[in-house]
Amino acid sequence: MKKRNDLIKWVSVIAAMIVMPLHVRAEESTLRVMSYNIHRGGVVHLKQPLSQTAKVIQAAKADIVGIQETRSPRGDTLEDLAKLLGWNHDEGSCIVTRYEIVEHFKGGKDYKGGIKVKLASDKHAYIFNLHLPSHPYQPYQLLGIRPKWHKHTNNITFIKTEAETIEWAKKARGAEIGKLLRQVKSIPDKEVPVFVVGDFNEPSHLDWTEAAAKAGRHPIKVAYPTSTEMAKAGFSDSYRKIYPDEMKNLGLTWSPKYKLDDPTTHPDRIDFVYFKGKGLQVKDVKILGENEENADLVVSPYPSDHRAVVATLTLPKKTK
């Protein structure tokens, strides 16, 4: 009799869960957001086919990807990449996604703009994509590096102080980041998920710390203005949210082309996935790259000079 009563009890519990109102059941959905500089259309580095770039995105199991450098010597490859994935794409913002695109936001030369996508259960999210100027690049200015590959290599002013670094960074990228943040501020729903991804061509104040400078990882401590402005606007850096110790977890995205001790460059984390929104939480972040030493997910041959970053996030389902 006791066993029968226990069985009836559990059946009742399960039945109650089935008919429980949606607003009582606290469920979550998963979203993977990625930033990927594919380098000259994804067909130049190591002479890899575009399908290898698609393979990187597939390995990340991404849902939305902000792409930088879509133009190849033969033309723009964004549409072809979207076809390989079987996804939607937005030419203006250079974003590809498995979701329906319901709204477009115009950007400019470096701030690519953004889109609004329809997620499951009629939820929506916004994603904005950036590819900020690479010149002048403050780590090179501080370290006295003239990269042979850069067209502005003979037009670099060397600097020494944090104040100079911040000033030069603001001149290079301040206007574009300002445009982005004004557009984000104009979104009517202040609780909706918003993502900003891109190749920022500027390190983070969370990486260039006093501790990192004392350890010789960077020449000096710098409170870089772009990452600082993102934080002030309420955005979280997904990588540092999961890996707050900048001394232990480097998350380097620049660059698979060079060894870590190569004196002609400076290894750094300049590709980001930022997020904000009510109930939005990052659960995991992975770096995609060329080998296990430098990446969490390996695709070989790796078809870009930037490692990619993908963040897995959860958000509560829309309640009635």
Describe each PLM feature range.
Residues 35-51, 72, 133-172:
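Acidic/histidine-rich helix-loop elements
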Residues 40-47, 66, 136-138, 205, ...:
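Short, solvent-exposed loop/turn elements at domain surfaces
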Residues 31-38, 53-74, 127-130, 164-211, ...:
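Active-site beta-strand/loop signature of hydrolases that rely on acidic residues for catalysis
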Residues 68-149, 287:
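Structured beta-strand-rich core segments of catalytic domains in phosphoester-bond hydrolases
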Residues 107, 116-118, 185-195, 201-320:
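Metal-dependent phosphoester-hydrolase catalytic domains
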Residues 51-52, 81-84, 144-146, 211-215, ...:
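Glycine-rich, phosphate-binding/catalytic loops in enzymes
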Residues 3, 9-14, 18, 22-83, ...:
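N-terminal, active-site-proximal structural segment of metallo-dependent hydrolase catalytic domains
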